[in-house]
């Protein structure tokens, strides 16, 4: 068999099985709430399951997204991500959830989730949401209550309040541990002059009325 044929077969098989390799492992049982810290004997990629005899309905309910977070900060926003660590019932299900509250003229500074895509639902208010692809192209939309927007996995994205009252969004991410890389936190203090400059830059995107897609000179693109 020619080398090119073997290579094509290899690439085809890789394409078929790669999604299973790079995504969260599928559950091997109906449910698997995370075991309490004291019951863990080994470290692993994920968490051990509780004994089936101790699983309760309360393992699948959380109140952690019921209330708005603290908005008394420079960016006037709060983002609360709930993973399997905080909500045991999520263990092995490959999802996590988040609530974001943004005061008037507030924003969620640019960040990314290295292990998950994010689907965001606007619960109340109006926001501008956008992300940058790897070529620096900005994809941005103005969203109203009930709208949904997608942030692709690993891409830098942001949210800004575009209304005259509190804006609240809820998100689902397709990993029980999506990770958060905050651009401002990674490079400089969130209350620094550079962070303030980023905030001003984001507000300029909003005020220019950019929508759909545009190429911009992004200070946090790399």
Curated annotation (Swiss-Prot):
Any keyword Metal-binding? yes
GO MF, any single term = manganese ion binding
Cysteines joined through disulfide linkages: 32-49
Q: Which Pfam family would be a valid example here?
A: Cupin_1
Localization (cell): Secreted, Extracellular space, Apoplast
The UniProt record gives the binding positions of Mn(2+) as 111, 113, 118, 157
Signal peptide positions on this chain: 1-23
Q: Which InterPro entries match?
A: Cupin_1 (IPR006045), Germin (IPR001929), Germin_Mn-BS (IPR019780), RmlC-like_jellyroll (IPR014710), RmlC_Cupin_sf (IPR011051)
Domain Cupin type-1 positions: 72-195
Task: List the keywords (alphabetical).
Answer: Apoplast, Disulfide bond, Manganese, Metal-binding, Secreted, Signal
Q: Name one GO cellular component term.
A: apoplast
Note the Gene3D superfamilies from the entry: Jelly Rolls
What the record says about family reads: Belongs to the germin family.
Function text = May play a role in plant defense. Probably has no oxalate oxidase activity even if the active site is conserved.
Quaternary structure and interacting proteins, as annotated? Oligomer (believed to be a pentamer but probably hexamer).
From the Swiss-Prot or TrEMBL record, give the protein name.
Germin-like protein 11-1
């Amino acid at each position: 068999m020619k080398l090119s044929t073997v290579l094509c077969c290899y690439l085809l098989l890789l394409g078929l099985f790669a999604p299973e390799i790079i995504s969260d492992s599928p559950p091997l049982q109906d449910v698997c709430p995370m075991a309490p810290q004291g019951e863990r004997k080994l470290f692993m990629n994920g968490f051990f399951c509780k004994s089936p005899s101790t699983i309760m309905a309360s393992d699948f309910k959380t109140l952690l997204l019921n209330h708005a977070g603290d908005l008394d900060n420079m960016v006037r926003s709060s983002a609360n991500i709930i993973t399997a660590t905080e909500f045991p019932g999520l263990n092995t299900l490959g999802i996590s959830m988040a609530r974001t509250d943004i005061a008037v003229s507030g924003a969620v500074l640019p960040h990314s989730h290295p292990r998950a895509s994010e689907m965001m639902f606007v619960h109340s208010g109006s926001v501008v949401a956008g992300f940058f692809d790897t070529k620096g192209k900005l994809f941005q939309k103005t969203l109203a209550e009930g709208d949904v927007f997608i942030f692709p996995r690993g891409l830098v994205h942001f949210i800004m309040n575009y209304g005259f009252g509190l804006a609240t969004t809820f998100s689902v991410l397709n990993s029980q541990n999506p990770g958060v890389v905050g651009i401002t936190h990674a490079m400089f203090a969130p209350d620094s002059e550079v962070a303030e400059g980023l905030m001003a830059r984001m507000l300029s995107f909003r005020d220019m009325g950019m929508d759909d897609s545009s190429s911009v000179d992004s200070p946090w693109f790399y």
